[in-house]
């Protein structure tokens, strides 16, 4: 409860201090994938840019969901507290005409890769090259600090015997004031 109060207070003070732009600096990341969906999935972070390489041996059907969990460290990376988490229907995000934070991130990634804009996704080699999260895409309520973003991609219902995990990514980053 105390950590929730601390996070809420810090977010309030950050908001009260204005909406100055922030820089999102990729530090490191790792991933694990299900060979049922990927022959290969590689994540590399070099010089604050992210590269992804993935090979899908078969069509990835509709129904792929992603849990995006954004966490902040209040003790320099020793432990993390959840700021927010959303479960997204990936097909809805990629094909939506509505703008959202997640849609904006995806559009930015499309500028640096060859991701599909429709579902289902056919077998193939997909990539992302030299991608940065531009300052205008960093939510203004994220205060400076150490962050962990967990991306959990799955089919079925999460945390049940019907869950079929496709991919997990952990990305560590810093948020700095520009």
Regions found by a protein language model. Name each.
Residues 128-136:
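Short edge beta-strand/strand-turn motifs with a hydrophobic/aromatic core
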Residues 2-115, 121-125, 137-178:
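N-terminal onset of structured domains
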